[in-house]
């Protein structure tokens, strides 16, 4: 059972979380699944049927002394079609829900074991970048590490979004990949209450989201 101290306006308490042992293989599975879902999959090449070439035979089959050829759209000629080239497709695949939940719990456990997880109940910010920087310094965040801020508080999100070393996500956007690519995790205490039910889910485009069920 991991005990996480809560700071902030309503801090002074702790949250007990039943976090699993970290298994790098599970984390790798979840991150690979997340990144596969983000791939655009728009690479496309033309086959010999799609290139702009005449379908007429280049020259007679016999009598010229040249090698036998049909039309110029074959892959052996410059400007011809591509054999077995890429076509638009989806790289996403399914990953069991329990594995996704376990991966997120392990990512939280990893940051907790390293002492890089901070729970906050009440940031008390006014939406100004200056107030966030001041709050960060008071709590040991000096910009030397990349920080992931997870909160639904609009004023906090507004205050932190222009800070170069901070990334802001809503609670619903909590995911394994973003946790692992930031050195520190600052999370709203509310998001940790149902931590055993958190789940990383795929998202479209370049944003990956999670869901607390």
UniProtKB/Swiss-Prot annotation:
Keyword annotations from UniProtKB, A to Z: Ribonucleoprotein, Ribosomal protein, RNA-binding, rRNA-binding
UniProt region (Disordered), positions on chain: 41-75
GO molecular-function terms, A-Z: rRNA binding; structural constituent of ribosome
InterPro entries with a match to the protein in the record: Ribosomal_uL4, Ribosomal_uL4-like, Ribosomal_uL4_dom_sf
Superkingdom as given in the UniProt entry: Bacteria
Cysteine disulfide partners in this protein: none
A Pfam short name: Ribosomal_L4
GO biological process, one term: translation
One CC-aspect GO term: ribosome
Subunit field text: Part of the 50S ribosomal subunit.
Sequence similarity: Belongs to the universal ribosomal protein uL4 family.
Function in brief: One of the primary rRNA binding proteins, this protein initially binds near the 5'-end of the 23S rRNA. It is important during the early stages of 50S assembly. It makes multiple contacts with different domains of the 23S rRNA in the assembled 50S subunit and ribosome.
HAMAP family found in the cross-reference section: Ribosomal_uL4_B
Record protein name field: Large ribosomal subunit protein uL4
Organism annotation: Deinococcus geothermalis (strain DSM 11300 / CIP 105573 / AG-3a)
